[in-house]
Amino acid sequence: MSQLRWWVVSQVLLLIAICSLDHSEGARVCPKIVPGLDKLRVGVDITKLDLLPLFDLGDNGFRSAVADYTCDRGQTAVVDGESFDVPDQVDSVVIESSGQQTSSVTTIKSESQISQALSISAGISVETAKAGFSSSASYAEMQEAITKYGRTVSQMSAVYTTCSANLSPNLLLGQNPLQTLSRLPSDFTADTQGYYDFIKTYGTHYFNKGKLGGMFLFTSETDMSYFQNKNSQQIEATVKATFASILSTETGGSSDESKEVIEFKESSLITSKFFGGQTNLAADGLTKWQPTIAKLPYFMSGTLSTISSLIADTTKRASMELAVKNYLLKAKVANLDRLTYIRLNSWSVGHNELRDLSAQLQNLKTKTIFSDADEKLLQSIEDQVSVPAWFSDRTTFCFRSTAVGSADQCNGQSTNTLCAEPNRYTQQYMDKTYLGDTGCRLVWKISTTESTDWFKSVKVNFRWYPTWSPCACGPVGTPFTISAPANSWTQDYLDVTNPKFGECMLQWMIEVPPTATLWAKNLEFCIDFTCGKKKQCVDANQWTEPYLDISAHEACGMSWALIAK
């Protein structure tokens, strides 16, 4: 049978399917659907999904309906004393009246964590989220806060659930998308624009499960300096206290703010927002706002399925999956182009390479179908400009002190190890070698549980020389240098500086090999010492300015940080 005859037969079968759907002429239209259930039948563009937008302006990612609702079975549910229709396509509805449920604190420190955090807040699987959100306004805002300004984003919410629902596992594609699909050829490459137009109209996914209600969302963008000398438990407690204070204030209450909350607010850009109900009533108190949520609920979270799974024609389903794959790759190109532009304006190393990458991205923007070579090129660009999760999440910079004699000289402990993730300072080490003559043995290390081959050649370098007495740390004016590759401690440096033995000049450097990716070549190493108020950051492969370790008659607080910009 010729290809043309096959096409004619497929169109006839498709028309028969359309006519046989339960939403055909004669099906009962739902006059009054349970509030909020309409969101379950609409498509979602996963690249633009912004379920909890930080700002009111912009595209939230919801698209046209992918399924039709009918009410032939006459199912109903009572919401706030009023009866509403439950569509036949909805498998189950639970009307709830839960009290306030407060989420845990979500902390986003790196660009690689944004999609994961947004997926958790929306109740979406992390696997699905790997390709999602990058074209949304909230993603762009967080990306800029983290990569351009070096801030940490924290989120917390109070949730008031009024309804949860599941769509039928036998859901059928709606009449409008089915008719649009019928006009497309079976081969994606024969009409790529037609498939992309379908995606622009109906999206890439739909929610097969959903939770509706009201929410108060708190978001903070906090300067890195705030986190110095605070552990994770202290930070989380302060974020929770700030959240509670702002929620109380926003709902007409009052709150006595602690000094910790005041300090956090002074170091942060904070936004807060109500979703669902008559939000203008929130200022009059929760008792005014909460009763309005049930009939004006917000779609808060859910579980996604692909629209392609609703396509019965296996050939067209495969073509739609290919179209979605390429559509997601186009979104990835746009995201990397935006990130590369940020890098050009914030990195000090590799501008020529970044311009070359930008030119390659401009070429990729013209693609409608991506080859395997294009995908490999995209991955190589991402490897250069995006800080990977293995570094931001599973790498630490560590310092350890060991007392030779009295622990009083060495932070009050015989052995003391202080570690910090990238973009965090270690807690302060209190240098008190003036209290004795035995001193403290000091070492440093970069640790990671996962890395690429070139990272094994990244080194911590430390050098020192005495200023007037060879007893302090060796011959006067002669620098001593020690270094250690990743996952190894440096050799011991014996710190015996005091008025009796003398003073020493100290310097540090993070050494990154030429084979490293661009993000690594733009690492910074920072020191923050209380004595002399010495605080500075230097690029990789550069020594910090000499620090004069006097250790005379006061303790000196010392902190170190590895910064991925």
Swiss-Prot record:
GO terms for biological process: defense response to virus. SMART domains: MACPF. InterPro entries: MACPF, MACPF_CS, Perforin-1_pore-forming. Residues 1-26 form the signal peptide. It is found in: Secreted; Target cell membrane. GO terms for molecular function: nutrient reservoir activity; toxin activity; wide pore channel activity. Residues 27-340 form the MACPF domain. It holds the Pfam family MACPF. Produced by albumen secretory cells. Found in developing eggs. Residues 387-565 are annotated as: Invertebrate MACPF Accessory Domain (IMAD). PROSITE patterns: MACPF_1, MACPF_2. PV2 is a very high density lipoprotein (VHDL). It contains 3.75% of lipids. The major lipid classes are free sterols and phospholipids and also have significant quantities of energy-providing triacylglycerides and free fatty acids. GO terms for cellular component: extracellular region; membrane; other organism cell membrane. Keywords: Disulfide bond, Enterotoxin, Hemagglutinin, Lipoprotein, Membrane, Neurotoxin, Secreted, Signal, Storage protein, Target cell membrane, Target membrane, Toxin. Perivitellin-2 is a dimer of heterodimers held together head-to-tail by non-covalent forces. The heterodimer is composed of the tachylectin subunit (31 kDa) and the MACPF subunit (67 kDa) that are disulfide-linked. PANTHER family: PERFORIN-1. The egg defensive protein perivitellin-2 is a pore-forming two-subunit glycoprotein that affects both the nervous and digestive systems of mammals. In addition, it is a source of both structural and energetic molecules during embryonic development. The tachylectin subunit (31 kDa) binds target membranes while the MACPF subunit (67 kDa) disrupts lipid bilayers forming large pores (inner diameter of about 5.6 nm) altering the plasma membrance conductance. This is Perivitellin-2 67 kDa subunit.
